[in-house]
């Protein structure tokens, strides 16, 4: 469920088809994102999932869509 929502948001932000995105999709290598893109997406997810502010050390560990889904899943359980 979390992964599907994130895939939809990533597809909207990067204007690509949802079917082109998997958990293994790399923000930088596959989508051409930079760190600011990841921060913007994370901020949108914080709002969508009512998450606290994402610590900077967590952001440095988010490289793929799956990494982001794992973080959101952990954060929503806390």
Tell where the protein language model's regions lie, with residue ranges.
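Phosphopantetheine-dependent thiolation modules in NRPS/PKS and related acyl-activating systems
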Residues: 1-33, 42-43, 47-78
